[in-house]
A protein has these predicted regions:
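C-terminal, active-site-flanking charged/polar segments
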Residues: 10-14, 75, 130-132
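In a subset of proteins, long, contiguous C-terminal domains/tails are tracked
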Residues: 189-227
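Non-catalytic, conformational "gating/processing" segments within enzyme and secreted inhibitor domains
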Residues: 1-7, 208-209
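Glycine-centered hinge/linker elements that transmit conformational signals in sensory
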Residues: 4-18
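His/Glu-based metal-binding/catalytic segments typifying zinc-dependent metallopeptidases
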Residues: 17-77
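M16 family metallopeptidases and their MPP-like homologs
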Residues: 45-66, 70, 83-190, 208-215
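Generic recognition of flexible, low-complexity loop/linker segments
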Residues: 37-39, 80, 95-98, 184-186, ...
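Short helix/loop capping segments that flank catalytic or ligand/cofactor-binding pockets
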Residues: 1, 59-62, 222-223
């Protein structure tokens, strides 16, 4: 990245221009927990659950990777519980993410659709698994397939590296001074279940919870001709 920057970007003619000023606006709400149930008119017996956990702490590159891995392991656990054991939904969406610009934030999003009367029980199970993630280690059997999958995805991506990839590398180096091609494989090789548990503990220690539920209105048992 350094060589490419010096040889190509650095060799482009430049001119003194106007320094752009901008304001970063963060619309986050300071309240730790926001929970609400919306009842709306829509067909079917539906209860849509959307949980978002947010933490504004600083996470290292290794911790960000561990956070992503935790999201994948949690997805597998919740799928086994909510779908396979409880038959309460077709699937569970779990996504962990972190950003450093325009402001720092790590998030964990969990969403699924079930029946109205199963919403609270399924939510209890999810919160129980979040707490379990914080206090108990995942097993190596849960971690290994995810590490293999990430390595395979990266290997396949490297076979199709194009200009977009290198532009992203150069942009990251220019903005943050980081060479993202250097260390990701090393972080992956050294990842342990203890690393995952540690980042879960850090993330959940001071987390904001956004708990939204959308339920369909209960159907009127009387048909139109009976009213």
């Amino acid at each position: 990245a350094v060589r490419l920057t010096n040889e190509y970007i650095g060799s482009l003619p430049s001119r003194k221009g106007k320094k752009e000023e901008y304001i970063i606006r963060n619309y986050d709400v300071g309240t730790d927990t926001i929970s609400h149930v919306f009842t709306v008119a829509m067909p079917g017996d539906k209860g849509m659950v959307n949980l978002m956990l947010e933490n504004n702490a600083k996470f290292s590159d290794k911790e960000q990777l561990a956070l992503n891995i935790w999201g994948q392991m949690l997805r597998n656990r919740l799928f086994a519980i909510v779908r396979e054991q409880e038959s309460a939904t077709y699937g569970v969406n779990v996504e962990a993410n972190s950003i450093t610009f325009p402001y720092r934030k790590a998030t964990m999003m969990i969403g699924f659709e079930t029946q109205r009367d199963k919403v609270e029980r399924m939510k209890e199970m999810i919160y129980k698994e979040l707490d379990r993630s914080q206090h108990e280690l995942f097993t190596q059997e849960e971690l290994t397939p995810i590490l293999v999958s990430i390595k395979l995805s990266r290997s396949q991506a490297e076979e199709n590296i194009g200009i977009d990839y290198w532009m992203n590398v150069l942009n990251t180096y220019a903005e943050y001074g980081e060479d993202v091609t250097d260390h990701s494989d090393k972080l992956l090789e050294g990842m342990t279940v203890e690393d995952v548990r540690d980042v879960v503990w850090k993330f959940l220690k001071k987390v904001k919870v956004r708990d939204w539920v959308i339920k369909s209105e209960e159907a009127d048992p009387l048909s139109d001709w009976e009213k």
